[in-house]
Structures are given as structure tokens and as C-alpha cells.
Amino acid sequence: MNPQWKNFLLSEQAVIENDGRIVFAESQSDQPHIYPISDLAVLSVSGKDAAKLLQGQSTCNVFEVTETQARIGAFCNPKGRAIATFLLAKQADAYLLVLPQELLEPVKTRLQKYVLRSDVRFADRSNELCLLGLGWSETAVESLFAAHCVDGMVLISLGSTPYRTLVIAEPEQAENLWTDRLGQGYAPGNSEDWRLLDLLGGIPWLDQATSEEHVPQMLNLDKLGGISFTKGCYTGQEVVARTHYLGKAKRALFLAECALGTAPAANAAIRDRNGGEQSRGQVLTAISRDGICHLLAVLLVSESGEYDLVLKDHPDVSLRLLPLPIA
């Protein structure tokens, strides 16, 4: 985190936990909120061959990314398993990859292997740029991943209800935006609350435990516009395309909740209530709040459309499936 931004948040009465989470005093839930984002980072990719390199490694069509249109996507290994998911935006001559902090260095190292003689430069800008989230109650008025460049900041619409925008800004811009929004009646929100909103919005962020576990369709990236089936070759493309052209994926991403005060770990097994020990899927990410656990899970798709599922380690706790904002 940028030191200037960190000191500003501390001056705004933030508490920064040892695990990086940023916490403020409680505020009314019906207020619009502004959130510091602590679990994501920014990798800049620039140079005249940047688009070509990214196009050959990502599931989305990089040539569709402009200063007014961002994209979600994934980098895959040769077996078609997603190494990391990302949001990709464009600012001037550089592409900005927003992805989990813990996967930035592995992604950067892997992409650098493909540079060879190309004019491509990578820069971890996590200590230069700040990530913020804006959330308010109105229904989305912009298309998902619509982008804007305003006063040097990049804004990406995340749709859903509440309507949300992710902001990439330099420290002074972030401070000014924070002060301005608080003056408009916004309340400071906890970084973990933003993570929960991402989860409820069906944004399939990966971590070290879930990296290289799932093909992109299992993460609903096709439904989020994060897979192009016409762009041509990229690493893992054959497996991703085969999954698409053979028909419906056998597994998909589901949103669920259960009465559990402690969130299960990533990859925790999920099974049928009366189906023995055979796994029906696993947890992708989970957050517990006030005795309710919200989770994204990759599950076998039921032909009947009926599910009676429990966590393997909590067989008495039923999972209730909820509709994803985009499914």
C-alpha cells in the first residue's frame, strides 16, 4: 500500500489489521459508502507490443479494451486452468491489470517469459496507485465493466445492486475523492465489506489455494464476457474452446449462504446431504458476517436443477443457493 495513502487512512480513523484489512467504525448500512481496497493490486503492462502479448495469454479480447471499456478475464496454464482472474483497463498507452495481491508476482513472472524480443514493460504499481470502491443503492445505470478516465483516475463499473464502481487513482486523487465523497454523505466502509460485495456480485477472484484449479467457464467468466471464442490462440485456449463447443460445462459457479459463523477455507469440500462422501464441488471463496456465511462455490451442475448440499466438514448445515447477478 502506498505510504501516503496509508497515512491518510489512519488520519481518517482507520484501523489497519495485521492481515491488511482496513476497518472503520460502524456506519448505517443504507448510506452510500467509499471503501479502501486492500487485497487487490495493479500491474501495469506497457510498450508497443503490450496488447499483442496480453492477447496471446488471456481469455478475453484485449483489443476490445479501451479507455471506455474494461474487461474481466483470466490467464490460464496449458491445461486451461485459470491461474488468476483480473480486471483489465486502459489508461493512455498502458494496460492496467487489477488482480489479487498474492497472485501479482506469479502472474508477472509468467508473463515475462513470453516477452522475448517484444517491446513490453511490466511494473508492479501497488505502491504507487490506490484502489477504492464506491457503492450506493441505485440500480446500475451503466453496462458491466464500462470504464471512464476522469481527472487521471480510472473508473470501472461493476454493476449489480448496490451499484458499484472500482477506482484506480494516485494518492492525492484518492485523498481528494475520499474527502469529496464524505462531504456528499458517503461513509467509510471496511475493506472486507468490499470483498463481500465482490463475492455477492459473482466476481470470481482467485488466491494461491484456488489458482490453477478451474477452467474459466467453471468461474462463469463466459457469462461475464471474460472469454472470447473468436479471438484466436492463447495459452490454454484449446481446453477452454473444447469445453465450450462440447456443450454446457459440467461445473459452474454458484452463490450460496449458510448459517455458519466461521468461513470455510478455499477448496473446502461440498457434498450431497444424503449422497455419502462423494464431492459435488468446493468452495472458491467465503466470508462470514453476523453468523451467516456467504460463499462462491464451483459445483457439479444438477440435470434436475435440484440441490441439497452441505459442507463436508459441517454436515448439519444446509447450503442455500442464491441467484447470481449474472448467470
List the model feature ranges, each with a label.
Residues 1-72, 76-77, 81-83:
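Acidic, proline/glycine-enriched N-terminal capping motif
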Residues 61-62, 112-120, 181-191, 274-278, ...:
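A common structural junction motif
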Residues 191, 197-222:
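Short, conserved active-site entrance elements at the starts or edges of catalytic domains
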Residues 24-30, 71-85, 115-116, 146-155, ...:
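Short amphipathic beta-strand starts and helix->beta connectors
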